[in-house]
Curated annotation (Swiss-Prot):
It is a peripheral membrane protein. The COPII coat is composed of at least 5 proteins: the SEC23/24 complex, the SEC13/31 complex, and the protein SAR1. Golgi apparatus membrane; Peripheral membrane protein; Cytoplasmic side. This is Protein transport protein SEC24-2. Residues 226-251 are annotated as: Zinc finger-like. Keywords: Cytoplasm, Cytoplasmic vesicle, Endoplasmic reticulum, ER-Golgi transport, Golgi apparatus, Membrane, Metal-binding, Protein transport, Transport, Zinc. The gene is SEC242. Residues 1-83, 102-129 are annotated as: Disordered. It comes from Naumovozyma castellii. Disulfide bonds: none annotated. The keyword Phosphoprotein does not apply. Pfam families: Gelsolin, Sec23_BS, Sec23_helical, Sec23_trunk, zf-Sec23_Sec24.
Length: 912
């Protein structure tokens, strides 16, 4: 007997909710009546085409507890990899696959290595655990199995003897650090033979707020480091018990422990965090960092454009309103955070904010400075004020600023002088400068001119003429900012040309970020909501001030370069005046000498100041096995990390060379890997025709490269340079999880979601429907689909959707009543299906406290034979449909070949 309380799977045409004949929430002017959201159909201006794709939470080995012995995360990952590979081989009708016990990999000297199927098999060193290589013909797996994008990387196989206290905590979490290669060639020749890149993907902080999942922290002020290489004590050092010393795993130097401390006497020594956790924090003594005598407070300086453009598009009001609502969210743990406001048009406007009193708000004094040639502060008092002591008066001032400038006719914006004066104001303290603008800087130092894109876009000159830095000020000023410990963030909202390519240099080289809102209108509720939520999330994010990043590696390895929004002081030292929580970095490695040991190591250390003024150290240590066998290198390669590395290098190629160089790099890199795999690994058997064979753990790499080539950052076509520039900006800063989402959007079929989808599980987490392939061929004309991109959510309503579906979702009777463009789903309490869809959308927008992005929802109705011929929406909806299907990246869209065509052409090139 069925349980009546269990929700039924949605099967149409049976309706769950019947709209009244006169809908209680009718659409008026394209918007839901009674809601603040306004619909904006994208007709004359295309929506912002942000990067796309998704990387969901990785699967866990659910039956780990049933294993006969303890399984580390690496063992669980290995079990998962084997299960996936076995499934792939079953699909390929391979036979005689041995039964595998993952625990056998961790039994010393068992010699139990799995025989690869169908490839060359060299003799392996007995006793050394290895990932085994499983072949797959990519052409037989079409459409691609996109769930493979959710898999963890091949496990890092470590023997217990490697660690002083072996446990699962010695494995570096891929949330913080992961390598493109989880088995490192022992020689540079072997690395070159593989054609695989060797790099680390670093995300120093997992969440926007440090209170979420903090790392273990040592608070006893002991920071133990190697006296030769300065590496930090970690789980992989060798403890010399007789001498109470330790051998550094990076350089081999023997070091002592502090004398007279019981913390470093046996058995207490083995309980220390340094020997237990590969990722951890330290609170050093005040004398540890001698460069900083007294940590200054956190400082936030806002430079706000008050020219006529910000009045017309409602951005000034939006900024003031969002800042008022965020005053209590700005980190102010020690009540020392300082705030300053500078407004700019053709002059600079300073505000002296008085202290709060019990008598109510007091008026602030405004000082107007028209001399833009030299930095000049009108007064030394009350320009930089305490957030705690002036909070009410700051709110009062912010609410008045739109009124003060509402009648302006000034079209100028002196950004350069405003930045110079802001740096002068905070030169002794550093901090963040946040610029909010709708106008191209057109006055004073840093003046920019519109660039003529006609005849240049989509040519060999595009990168040099449209995406280069137009004025040297935007590079030279960042050098000064790094000296003064100032980070610059940009929030740009405009329908006009803004030269994002030039302005983004300010954030790129100071550790900040550029946020762009094209076609912004504050009167459109979706635009207002998106900016307000992202601005508030950005301001509430914890920060690490005065940060330096120092990567280290074993003897024989070399740090080549670092990529991301950072300032490179040297190849192995990067600085960030204020390190955010929502970016990642790539550190490229090389092999300069033969690696003779069984393992090599990398360590990334961050020295920074917290928001409370304390110095802190975060250390991430990664141990990797070495190998002399090319099979092991391929079998242990991380396809998602490789794709992230490719994206960073391709971005560099665009900026330093051209788009053709970037596209050639992506294509050639993939081809060389496949050629060498075929040459060195594959046993050719062409009886059944030419195949495109690859290792199972790398089979999604061609898809990812193809998606990068189709991304707005790299694809061919005439693309507005500001959209191109912001896409490149995101490519060089997005964390791996969101960069994969950038390349391959997640698509959900909603009209047939499982019973549990949209409802909380036993832990209160909303269950998501299974993803489907990004292809229009999977879309039913009567269906309902959600396309999840990094910046937007697109709800695709099939043009032949039946009335029951339309009623359940929108409370309407006819699919042609559904609005198109920016909107929100109405809340229909009587429709359980509507509530489940709203929960799915809210869950996606939460971003797991990892990104500030709030995705705008677009509703797009598919075409139908019953569509009214003379509908006024027809001309407006066609470009919206074309934009939506451009995210279905497996198809032949935006003038690019489909994934199937890409593979066929790739095979043809490889066989020449």
């Amino acid at each position: 007997m069925s349980n009546p309380s269990r929700p039924k799977k949605r099967v149409y045409p049976t309706a769950q909710y019947v709209a009244p004949s006169s809908p209680s929430m009718p659409f008026q002017g394209g918007a839901f009546s009674g809601q603040t959201m306004q619909s904006q159909v994208s007709g004359s201006a295309s929506p912002y085409m942000a990067p796309s794709g998704q990387f969901t939470q990785p699967m866990n080995a659910s039956d780990a507890q049933n294993q006969p012995q303890f399984m580390t995360p690496a063992q669980q990952q290995l079990k998962q990899q084997i299960s996936q590979a076995t499934t792939s081989m079953n699909d390929m009708h391979l036979h005689n696959v041995p039964v595998i016990d993952p625990n056998a990999y961790y039994q010393p000297n068992n010699g139990n290595n799995i025989q690869p199927t169908g490839e060359n098999k060299p003799s392996l060193t007995p006793g050394r655990p290895t990932n085994n290589l499983y072949p797959v013909d990519i052409l037989t797996e079409l459409p691609p199995k996109i769930n493979d994008l959710n898999l963890l990387p091949p496990p890092i196989l470590l023997e217990p003897e490697i660690s002083t206290k072996f446990s699962e905590s010695v494995y570096a979490s891929p949330d913080y650090i992961r390598s493109t290669l989880n088995a490192v060639p022992q020689s540079n020749a072997l690395l070159k033979k593989s054609k695989l890149p060797f790099a680390l993907i670093i995300k120093p902080f997992k969440h926007l707020h440090d209170m979420n999942a903090p790392l273990p922290c040592n608070e006893d002020e002991f920071v133990i480091r190697c006296r030769r290489c300065r590496g930090y004590l970690n789980p992989f050092v060798k403890i010399l018990q007789v001498e109470s010393k330790w051998r550094c795993n990076f350089c081999g130097c023997i070091n002592g422990f502090p004398d007279g401390s019981e913390h470093f006497q046996l058995p207490n020594l083995y309980n220390r965090n340094e020997l237990t956790y590969s990722s951890m924090d330290f609170l050093p003594s005040s004398s540890y960092s001698q460069q900083v005598k007294e940590e200054p407070p956190a400082v936030y300086t806002f430079v706000i454009d008050v020219s006529i453009n910000t009045i017309k598009n409602g951005y000034l009001f939006s900024v003031a309103n969002a800042l008022v609502n965020s005053l209590d969210l700005i980190p102010n743990h020690d009540n020392k955070t300082l705030i300053s406001l500078i407004c700019a048009d053709s002059s600079l406007h300073y505000f002296s904010v008085p202290l709060d009193t019990e008598d109510g708000p007091k008026e602030s004094s405004m000082f107007d400075i028209s001399d833009l040639d030299e930095p000049f502060l009108p007064t030394s008092n009350s320009l930089l004020v305490s957030l705690s002591q002036c909070r009410n008066n700051l709110e009062h001032l912010l609410l008045k600023i739109p009124e003060i400038f509402k009648s302006t006719t000034i079209q100028s914006f002196a950004l350069g002088p405003a930045l110079q004066n802001a740096s002068e104001l905070v030169k002794d303290k550093g901090g963040k400068v946040i610029v909010c603008s709708s106008t191209l800087p057109n006055m004073g130092i840093g003046k920019l001119n519109p660039r003529d894109e006609r005849g240049i876009s989509n040519t060999s000159k595009e990168s040099k003429d449209l995406l280069s830095c137009q004025d040297a000020f935007y590079r030279s000023f960042t050098v000064e900012c790094n000296k003064l410990q100032i980070t610059i963030d940009l929030f740009i909202a405009s329908g006009n040309y803004m030269d994002i390519a030039t302005l983004s240099n300010l954030s790129k080289y100071t550790g900040g970020q550029t946020h762009f809102y094209p076609q912004f209108l504050g009167s459109v509720a979706a635009d207002f909501t998106k900016f307000s939520k992202e601005f508030s999330r950005h301001l509430s994010m914890d920060l690490s001030f005065r940060t330096v990043m120092r990567p280290r590696c074993s003897i024989g390895l070399r740090i080549e370069d670092s990529y991301g929004h950072l300032f490179n002081r040297s190849t192995d030292l990067c600085s960030f005046p204020a390190m955010p929580r929502d970016q990642s970095y790539v550190v490229e490695l090389s092999i300069e000498d033969k690696l003779t040991a069984d393992y090599c190591y990398a360590q990334i250390a961050f020295l920074y100041s917290t928001g409370t003024g304390k110095r802190k150290i975060r250390v991430l240590t990664l141990a990797l096995p070495t190998t002399t066998i090319l099979h092991n290198v391929f079998a242990s390669a991380d396809q998602l990390a490789i794709a992230t590395y490719f994206a960073r290098i391709a971005t560099e190629k665009v900026m330093k060379n051209s788009f053709d160089h970037a596209r050639s790099f992506l294509n050639t890199s993939l081809e060389e890997i496949l050629i060498n795999y075929r040459k060195e690994i594959v046993v050719e058997n062409n009886a059944g025709g030419v195949t495109l064979r690859f290792s199972t753990n790398l089979k999604m790499l061609p898809l990812l490269v193809h998606m990068l080539l189709k991304n707005i950052a790299f694809r061919k076509g005439v693309i507005p340079s500001d959209l191109r520039a912001i896409a490149l900006n995101n490519m060089e800063s997005l964390p791996l999880k969101y960069l994969i989402k950038n390349a391959y959007p997640t698509v959900y079929s909603l009209h047939d979601i499982p019973d549990e989808a949209g409802l909380p599980d036993e832990n209160g987490v909303i269950v998501m429907p299974p993803p489907m392939n990004d292809t229009i061929s999977s879309f039913e004309k009567y269906g309902l689909y959600l396309i999840n991109t990094p910046n937007e959510l697109i709800l695709w309503v099939g043009g032949n959707a039946i009335p029951e579906l339309v009623s359940d979702v929108f409370g309407l009777q006819d699919v042609f009543q559904v609005p198109n463009g920016k909107n929100e789903l109405p809340e229909l309490p009587e429709s359980e299906f509507n509530q489940r869809l709203r929960s799915i959308i809210e869950n996606i927008r939460a971003n797991d406290d990892e990104q500030i992005t709030y995705q705008t929802l677009y509703i797009v109705r598919g075409n139908s034979q019953n569509e009214p011929a003379n509908s006024s929406q027809n001309k407006e909806i066609v470009p919206l449909r074309n934009w939506a299907v451009s995210f279905l990246v497996e198809d032949n869209v935006v003038g690019c070949e489909s994934y199937r065509e890409f593979l066929q052409n790739l095979k043809t090139r490889l066989n020449k």
